[in-house]
Amino acid sequence: CHEGAHILLMFLLGAPPALVKLTALGCRMVPNREKILSYGQMALVSFAGPGTNLLCAGGMFLLGLEAHPFFGANLVLGMLHSLPIEPMDGGMAFHALLRARMKGERADKLCFAVSLGLILPMAGLGFVILLRTRYNFTLLVMSLYLMLYLVLKRDLFSG
């Protein structure tokens, strides 16, 4: 429902994606060139996915289903994707909102700094978790992937 929310909102805004490309770590949507979304609309589209996850988790909580695995999955996915780290949805929304308020290069630099400022502690925490558990490397690997993406500005697993 996460990716579907992005696509549905793009259709509702009259700008369906020209191409939806599945990658190893999610989905990349190539924008439609016939209708360009405003920065505010881009931010809304970016938040549609994590917002849907958080709404699903909230609904499950209200129904007393917080022990169900989908509750935790939706909650974590929604919270993680809301972080203002590019290329996460929150980072894309943050970047769009910055570009609406300041010149492109300044917005790009600020978004990069905020993303890096959040990724570095995540990587440190991931390393601590790996040392303590001796097997859980998930946060460390995700942080390293995000750092490489941020520096290279491309999806490393997009095939």
Describe each region flagged by the PLM.
Residues 1-159:
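Hydrophobic transmembrane alpha-helices and their immediate loop junctions
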